Each structure stands twice: as C-alpha cells, then as structure tokens.
Design a protein with these regions (language model features):
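Intrinsic-disorder/low-complexity detector
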Residues: 1-52
Length: 52
C-alpha cells in the first residue's frame, strides 16, 4: 500500500468513528505511521472547524 493510500485510509477512518488505536497496520511500518498521520490530520481538521 502506498503511503498516500494509508494516509487517506486513516483520514477516512477518523470520520467513520474509528479510534487511533484501530490502526490496522503493523506497528513500526510506514503504513502504520501514514494511517495515524491521516487520522490525526482529520481530527485536527475537525477541531479547527469547531473553533470557527
């Protein structure tokens, strides 16, 4: 899986209600880190919109 795919998967997972601990990728892999980065980006986007 490409890093970008994992990022998008994590981003979408946040909006689907997944917890960061639901990351399906093996720890200490690029996909795991990318998925988590996507999840965290979505959460930041969610909170940033809540402030406005």
């Amino acid at each position: 899986m490409a890093d970008n795919d994992a990022f998008e998967e994590g981003y979408d997972a946040y909006w689907d209600g997944a917890d960061v601990s639901d990351n399906p990728h093996e720890e200490d892999t690029d996909d795991h880190r990318s998925w988590e980065a996507g999840w965290r980006a979505a959460r930041k986007h969610d909170y940033d919109e809540s402030d406005g």
